[in-house]
Amino acid sequence: MPHIELKTVEQLRWMREAGLVVASIHEALRAAVRPGITTRELDEVSAQAIADGGGASNFLGYYGYPATVCISVNDVIVHGIPGDYELAPGDIVSFDCGAFIERGGKQWHGDAAFSVIVGEQFIEDADFAAGTRATGAIAGVDQDLLRERRELDAVTRESLWAALAGLATGKRISAVGKAVETVVAENALINGWEAGIVEEFV
């Protein structure tokens, strides 16, 4: 059976500290997203948030990666590189954010992603859990496309919460992946999608 390393209370505190730096990146990026801003400018927002939080980027320079955040727009699945692209209303944008801190002679890493639809107000987690969903039109955006992107965003967030609910004492990390896959598969069946996990990136 594989060895499972148990963390000390102090180590868990350091892990949380790294996670809070990543949470601050999320907050800064959500506040900055707007039509017309470039993904490179959003990377600058990310870099500033990392510095303000007392962390360092665990993306910048990794195998030559040139930025502090991965920004994937529309049909880019993952690991999009920030550049000159200007966000447009209705774009669905995924931000994969990371940072680390150094404590106790080691690096402690945080890494988390979120998605937004440009031109819509971000629905906070508590409101989303209570059933709040985006409605209405975004000027100049095809409504069928917008509906599909809203559905994708909602299912993704639902799968995240299912994964978190699957974590418990004595459970293995594989429970997270199983929970995500189950939610995606169930919603694909309900909505008639051809959807699933992109296994090549897992």
What is the predicted role of each segment?
Residues M1-V202:
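Active-site neighborhoods and metal-handling regions in enzymes and metal-associated proteins
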